[in-house]
Amino acid sequence: MGERTGTAFLRGWLGKDFVSKITRRRAMTAEQRLLVGTDQVEAINRLRPVAILAHLLGALIALDALARSSSASIAPAWFVVMLAVIIFDILSGPPLAGHRPARGEVAALYWRNIATCFLFGAVWGSLALIFYAGAEDDVRHVLTVLLTAYLASSAFILAALPRAVFAFSMPMAIMMIVSFTRAGVADHAFELQLIGVYALAFPIALRQHASAFAERVVAMAQVGEQTQLISLLLHDFEANSSDWHW
């Protein structure tokens, strides 16, 4: 009785489509969840070379900008940490040429990707936390553009795995907010507003994308099963037809 009342309330308040998505998601079988997780990990693995190259190029840009600042002496240490995380990602992950995980690999690779994204987000966030307050205006401009680009693009590159987006963006956004606040809220109102818009808009978009991604994976699996069943039925029909002709 309570569940029916709650469902009716949700249908009236949020709409039938929203509730039906929750119901379908909750009714997903363990096999379907494994299939969705497999496709999520595979999608992330395909983009890992692009992400690794982007991290390396961005770190080089940051190092070049910091070489002209008062923090030039400690900038190489930050760059070494970024290189260490990149090497860790390469060595601990699957082949960079694209890899569809086996059933037994899905859970480990799923959480490995999330942990690696958190490390990258923390390193990028530390760039602002360590260097922004004492940097010159031109260096601040480079750091702001660079960090904003990585924060925004993470929602697209990692969209197949929403938890990875949050693992990457949360530490980065928090450290950017702290850095901008320390440098003066009034002078960085625009940047703080952009982060606020990101925090409000992208989770909604990610949720919709994740629902559509899961529905598409399950639908394609069902189509494959039905196609296989039809092929078997046609094969049996052809075999029986040949017996009748004989």
For each predicted feature, which ranges?
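Juxtamembrane or sensor-core-proximal signal-transducing alpha helices
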Residues: 196-229
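Short, charged cytosolic
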Residues: 2-33
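Hydrophobic transmembrane alpha-helices
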Residues: 114-204
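Hydrophobic alpha-helical transmembrane segments of multi-pass membrane proteins
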Residues: 26, 30-31, 44-100, 196-197, ...
